[in-house]
Amino acid sequence: MPSATDPPAALPLTLDLDDFKGDFSFDALFGTLVDELLPEFRGDDAPGAPPPPPPVLGAAPPVFPAVDELLGLFKHSCKELVDLRRQIDKRLQNLKKEVATQDAKHRKTLGELEKGVDGLFDSFARLDSRISSVGQTAAKIGDHLQSAESQRETASQTIDLIKYLMEFNSTPGDLMELSPLFSDDSRVAEAASIAQKLRSFAEEDVGRHGVPSAVGSANASRGLEVAVANLQEYCNELENRLLARFDTASQRREMSTMAECAKILSQFNRGTSAMQHYVATRPMFIDVDIMSIDIQVVLGEEGPQADHICIAEGLSVLYKEIADTVRREATTIMAVFPSPNEVMSILVQRVLEQRVTAILDKLLIKPSLANLPPIEEGGLLHYLRVLAVAYDKTKELAKELQSISCGDLDIEGLTESIFVSHKDEYTEFEQASLRQQYQSKMAELRAEAKQQSESTGTIGRSNGAAVTTSLQQQISVTVVTEFVRWNEEAISRCTLLFSQPATVAANVRSIFACLLDQVSQYLTEGLDHARESLNHAATQRDRYVIGTSVSRRVATAAANAAEAAAAAGESSFRSFMIAVQRCASSVAILQQYFSNTISRLLLPVDGAHPSACEDMGSAVSVVEAAAHKGLLQCIDTVMSEVERLLSSEQKATDYRTPDDGAAPDHRPTNACIRIVAYLSRVLEVAFSALEGLNKQSFLTELGNRLHKGLLNHWQKFTFSPSGGLRLKRDITEYGEFVRSFNAPSIDEKFELLGIMANVFIVAPESLASLFEGTPSIRKDALRFIQLRDDYKTAKIASMLNSIMAE
């Protein structure tokens, strides 16, 4: 190994450029440099490493013995690194020069290439222009050649057509001398095409010379007219031959032959005759038995007596069979005809106009409004129900046919046209039907009432009573509900038959007006019947009013009759209150029906809903007016009984008890007890029957009448102080009862009565103090003071004069 003092040239090269290539690692380079000088650098576990020498006793180990060698090695390595860097720099300079030289050559080459490419592009442009010019020339030549060929073919065809035209122009009606083309069945399509061309040319020429101005043109025109006639005859004969062949193929179900004939026939009037002929020969249009079978299917086993439900089921079955038949025909039409949509349009139109219309004509026999069918046979309602189901099922059939195919046919408009005569008069028939049902129901109710009257018997004429019908003809909410159900059914028919909002609204208003009339008339008549019972009771009361100078027997009989009249009045009162309650329920049902069903149909049209509300308000007002009259009569009935009880039960001694030293009676008088019991009993039904303002106004009026009646009654008596106490007890009893009226004004009046009764209780000198707190009762109190039994003896009159003077 060289020593550290050796010159650098003596040291071998330790570094090379390859050491720095690839994945360079300084640790690996360092290890390679010092590997020989520092074998322990490889680690204790390095394979083949000799064990360290044993230490020498007494000698100090060197600190780092290889430092000089390493220092020389590192200096030498640094020098090598500098040399390597210079080599690399030199090589880089050489590479840069070479790159610059190559770049210059490359740029020069690119410049020359660009010039060559530009020249090449110019050459291509000139070549493209030349090719385009040659192409245009070739295209023109081709067009000329094609035009020439076309002209040649046209000329050839024209020659042939002129030849054929001359054949048709030879002799009128003579088709025997025609070319074989026109009689060859294998060339029918070609013959048809040529015949149509000749016919078109000849007809055009005849039309152009229709008014000849010269002899020559006239002769030419007459010659072509012969050709036109012969061509027409030939076309007709050819068309008939094709139709016959088409029919034969149709019977054999030879689709290809049918399609061939249909294609050829399409040249004659666009194939209209073939289409119409095919549709007309369908079995459902020519079989005479189909009509009778159809009507049997619709009516079922019940025959002419079939109801609308059976008819609806029958129509569903029949229309399904028709739709299936059309669907099968559509399959054939699609496979045979070149214009299947036109054929389907003709077929569907024929189905609706012939087969469906024939069925509907049998079903929808419009009745006469002047001579309505009997209600036992269904009346007008049967016709309307059948009309609705027929319209509904026919619309379903139309939708089904449209889904199959109907071409450009306006199937919806065609369906509507079938029913137009029925829809034009629908509203009149619906109104007449509702009136007929109402009249029938009223006749039924009258018959039931008569039967009930006959079964229960009549009140004997010996007691002077007449037969009443109010109990048998009471208002029924069930009947009103039935009216609403009729109207709801009619409205459902109306919305089914019509779709335009304005038309629907107009018809709905007319139909709803029938319900308003029916409910108003029924309720008003029911209230009038109930009022008749009140009138009858009033007549009974008036009949048995007698004078004072009669025998005991007559008086007893009259009293018994008055009791009977009172019982009749109470019964009539209850009946009328029940009638009013049912009226209120019926009107509520009517209003609910209007809100739920009628309103939504009227709101889309301006003014329709407010007008209907006004109509309903007018109808309800009529019922309310009748109810108001009856309620006033009820008050008269109650007050008449109150007056009778006051007259018969109130004794003079009730308020003028003898001064015998006995304790005063603080109980109400018998008349008061009887009246309060009567009012409690009779008004119980009124409390439950009346509601809201009706109840409030009725009880307020009754309270005012009761107050006035009691005042007038008490002015017939003379009162002692103890009688005044008893009067006050009566007033308290009456006041407690009328408090159930919930009428503050009535409560106040009876409270003032209680205060006013004090004029009979206080001493004469204390009367003036009674008016200080309540001056409003002064006028009535002054009248009551005169009823004191000591009015004259206590000189109360002079005392009152001084009070009035003050």
From Swiss-Prot:
Recorded superkingdom: Eukaryota
Entry's Gene Ontology cellular component terms: cytosol; exocyst; extracellular exosome
Record's keyword annotation contains Kinase: no
Pfam families, per database record: Sec10_HB, Sec10_N
GO biological process: exocytosis; Golgi to plasma membrane transport; protein transport
Alphabetical UniProt keywords: Coiled coil, Exocytosis, Protein transport, Transport
Coiled coil (residue ranges): 77-109
Subunit note: The exocyst complex is composed of EXOC1, EXOC2, EXOC3, EXOC4, EXOC5, EXOC6, EXOC7 and EXOC8.
The family this protein is said to belong to: Belongs to the SEC10 family.
Function noted in UniProt: Component of the exocyst complex involved in the docking of exocytic vesicles with fusion sites on the plasma membrane.
Annotated protein name in UniProt: Exocyst complex component 5
Upper classification of the organism: Eukaryota, Viridiplantae, Streptophyta, Embryophyta, Tracheophyta
Gene transcribed to yield this protein: SEC10
